[in-house]
């Protein structure tokens, strides 16, 4: 399918929204078996279309390289055998998850005689705007279907062919089980005006989930009239406390930084307690550079004093600037700062971090508990890599995004994050006095 520009974007989007709203009402009433059948039907169609999808992705990758797409976006754009298999497994995982819809909690009797509680229900229609990552098309669709929501997906132009190939499979799977084809709509236009329409269609769309660069998220947050679930960036920290286990400190730091660069849960700043910096920082820095010889370390004055004469690190070191403490690199670059202790670490993270994911490496229980209480982030970890901040790793099956907001959903947003609760009341003819 080739890229198309809709001449009347407003009319096109109004129709998309209207169909999504109608589909959402049917989905809200669908039972768990029907939703799981749809997911597995999509799985089977997708599995048989592997070569077509990978071929479409090759077209996108070739275009991305010709258009000088940066390395982080190319990494997110690529679909290989392992990522394709992960997409298939993700569908199975979501199908296996408990269905939150219809769950009733907090039932209680009131003195008036009424019996009341809360029932979990879908949000309705989800609008998603994202860059690269064609696997997100499938993950978002599967979570929306399982949680009883219709979804409108607007991927980036760089992933157009991949997204349309996946959309074709989703549509066929839905048709195979008799579910509305408008339950999942992948926009067939690259016109940016479609985004402006989507984020202002309050009569049809209940929530917007943007995933992409900081500029995209800022624009959506500024212009949207529909509520937004978002995070701006992932400036994640690892703090090596004076009571850290050296082996854990080294292994976690290497994994958090070098496992993948193009992800929002990758460590961007390493903080080290000055009490152990002389002994431990060189070992950590050497291990990180050994893991990736392209690594560049940007150091504060104290870190420079410790590392500048290290021959192994020659060519990998430079002085940090004030901007480095606020930067999500998405690249083999790591900022390193030496601190006086946990007080300064917490202050630095809460000042410069993005409230995404932050880690402390320590064997001191008291300090670990203080860190998780006082660091203001969606995920706070003790002795584990920030790379675990992920819906799949958290047992959510998949995630539609990660939220650093504090209202409605925070952290990886899975099925429950795509629902709300309504009050239900049972009575026997009670009237209010």
Swiss-Prot record:
Highest taxon in the source lineage: Bacteria
Sorted alphabetically, which SUPFAM superfamilies does this protein's record hold? Answer: ALDH-like
Keyword set, alphabetical order: Amino-acid biosynthesis, Cytoplasm, NADP, Oxidoreductase, Proline biosynthesis
Respond yes or no to whether keyword Hydrolase is given for this record.
no
Instruction: Fetch the Pfam families from UniProt.
Output: Aldedh (PF00171)
The record's listing under CDD domains reads: ALDH_F18-19_ProA-GPR
Q: Where is the protein localized?
A: Cytoplasm
Catalytic activity, EC: 1.2.1.41
Q: What class of enzyme is it?
A: oxidoreductase
Gene Ontology terms: biological process? L-proline biosynthetic process
Q: One MF term in GO for this entry?
A: glutamate-5-semialdehyde dehydrogenase activity
Matching InterPro entries? Ald_DH/histidinol_DH (IPR016161), Ald_DH_C (IPR016163), Ald_DH_N (IPR016162), Aldehyde_DH_dom (IPR015590), Glu-5-SA_DH (IPR012134), GPR_dom (IPR000965)
Q: Transmembrane ranges?
A: none
| Pathway annotation from the record | Amino-acid biosynthesis; L-proline biosynthesis; L-glutamate 5-semialdehyde from L-glutamate: step 2/2
> Which family is annotated?
Belongs to the gamma-glutamyl phosphate reductase family.
Full protein name: Gamma-glutamyl phosphate reductase
Gene encoding this chain? proA
């Amino acid at each position: 399918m080739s890229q198309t520009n809709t001449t009347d974007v407003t009319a096109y989007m109004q129709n998309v929204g209207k169909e999504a709203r109608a589909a959402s009402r049917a989905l809200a009433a669908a039972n768990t078996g029907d939703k799981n059948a749809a997911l597995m039907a999509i799985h089977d169609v997708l599995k048989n279309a592997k070569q077509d999808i990978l071929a479409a992705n090759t077209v996108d990758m070739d275009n991305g390289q010709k258009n000088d797409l940066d390395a982080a976006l190319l990494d997110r754009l690529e679909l290989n055998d392992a990522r394709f298999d992960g997409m298939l497994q993700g569908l199975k995982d979501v199908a296996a998850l408990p269905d939150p819809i219809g769950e009733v909690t907090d039932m209680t009797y009131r003195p008036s005689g009424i019996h009341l509680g809360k029932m979990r229900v879908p949000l309705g229609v989800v609008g998603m705007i994202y860059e690269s990552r064609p696997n997100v098309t499938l993950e978002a669709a599967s979570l929306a279907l399982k949680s009883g929501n219709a979804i409108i997906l607007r991927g980036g132009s760089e992933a157009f062919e991949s997204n349309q190939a996946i959309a074709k499979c989703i549509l066929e799977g839905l048709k195979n089980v008799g579910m509305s084809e408008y339950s999942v709509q992948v926009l067939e236009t690259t016109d940016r005006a479609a985004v402006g329409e989507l984020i202002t269609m309050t009569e049809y769309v209940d929530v917007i989930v943007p995933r992409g660069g900081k500029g995209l998220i800022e624009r959506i947050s500024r212009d949207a009239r529909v509520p937004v679930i978002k995070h701006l960036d992932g400036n994640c920290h690892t703090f090596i406390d004076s009571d850290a286990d050296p082996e854990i400190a080294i292994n976690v730091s290497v994994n958090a930084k070098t496992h993948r660069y193009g992800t929002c849960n990758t460590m961007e700043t390493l903080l080290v307690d000055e009490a152990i910096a002389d002994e431990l920082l060189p070992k950590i820095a050497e291990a990180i550079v050994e893991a990736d010889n392209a690594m560049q370390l940007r150091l504060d004055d104290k870190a420079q004093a410790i590392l500048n004469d290290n021959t192994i690190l020659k060519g990998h070191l430079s002085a940090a600037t004030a901007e480095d403490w606020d930067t999500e690199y998405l690249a083999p670059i790591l900022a390193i700062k030496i601190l006086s202790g946990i007080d300064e670490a917490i202050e630095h993270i809460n000042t410069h971090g993005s409230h995404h994911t932050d880690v402390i490496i320590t064997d001191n229980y008291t300090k670990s508990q203080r860190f998780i209480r006082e660091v203001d982030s969606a995920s706070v970890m003790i002795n584990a890599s920030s790379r675990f901040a992920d819906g799949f790793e958290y047992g959510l099956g998949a995630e539609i995004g990660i939220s650093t907001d504090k209202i409605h959903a925070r952290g990886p947003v899975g099925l429950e994050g795509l629902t709300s609760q309504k009050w239900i009341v049972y009575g026997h003819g009670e009237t209010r006095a």
